Every structure is written in C-alpha cells, then in structure tokens.
Design a protein with these regions (language model features):
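Conserved beta3 VAIK motif of the Hanks protein kinase fold
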Residues: 94
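Sec-dependent N-terminal signal peptides
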Residues: 4-15
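Surface-exposed, glycine-biased beta-strand/turn segments
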Residues: 18-91, 99-103, 107-111
Length: 113
C-alpha cells in the first residue's frame, strides 16, 4: 500500500510545483458551455467555450504575458481569432470573437486584447 501512495506523491509534487496559473480570459462569466476533449461528430473539441449569455462586447483578457502571434478571420471554424504566444512558449487561442478593437491596439498593461 505504501508503494502506490509514494508513486502518486512522486507524480503529484512536480505537477503541483510546475502548474501554471493563468488569468481568466474574459469578463463575460465563469461558466463553460463546452470543455476540452468533448466528443463532437468525427472530432474532439479543442478548447473551452465560455458562456456569454448570447451577448457581445465582453473583453478578451490575455491569460498571461506574451505577444500577439497571429490574427485571422475565417468564415468557418474559429471565425475571428487571436493567437497569443505566451511567455512559457504555449499558445493561447481566443476564438469566436465578435470583433477586433476599433483602433487596433493591444493594451498590455491591463492584459486586455
């Protein structure tokens, strides 16, 4: 019994120490409408969808320090999307956006995209 518990602790400690804490990406809500890995027809969902109560105009907030790596618009898939390269090398994707800022600026101090 001690061995499995010890193995669990060996796994748990580095996981907790290396865990990254990100900011919540919007002021819309903290409710999810879809989660990562949900099965969809012929594919798995590749993100988290946040409930916006069918309203637009909420802020998209950068989850961590980094820079805007790519901005795209497509008629299917993500629609209006911003890719942010984070300081830890990961990429945050802000998809299904209603619009981009009118003045085209990024406010890094407030972490608002």
């Amino acid at each position: 019994m001690k061995k499995p518990f010890l193995l669990f602790l060996i796994y748990l400690v580095p996981t907790c120490v290396l865990a990254q804490t990100y900011l919540w990406p919007t002021d819309a809500s903290r409710y999810l409408t879809s989660t990562f890995g949900e099965y969809r027809s012929r594919h798995f969902h590749a993100g988290l969808d946040i409930k916006t109560w069918n309203q637009t105009g909420y802020k998209a907030i950068a989850v961590d320090d980094g820079y805007i790596w790519r901005i795209r618009t497509s008629y299917n898939g993500y629609g209006k999307v911003i890719y942010q390269k984070l300081s830890d090398g990961r990429i945050a994707v802000y998809a299904h956006l209603d619009r981009f800022t009118d003045d085209g600026t990024v406010r890094s101090v407030a972490h608002v995209i």
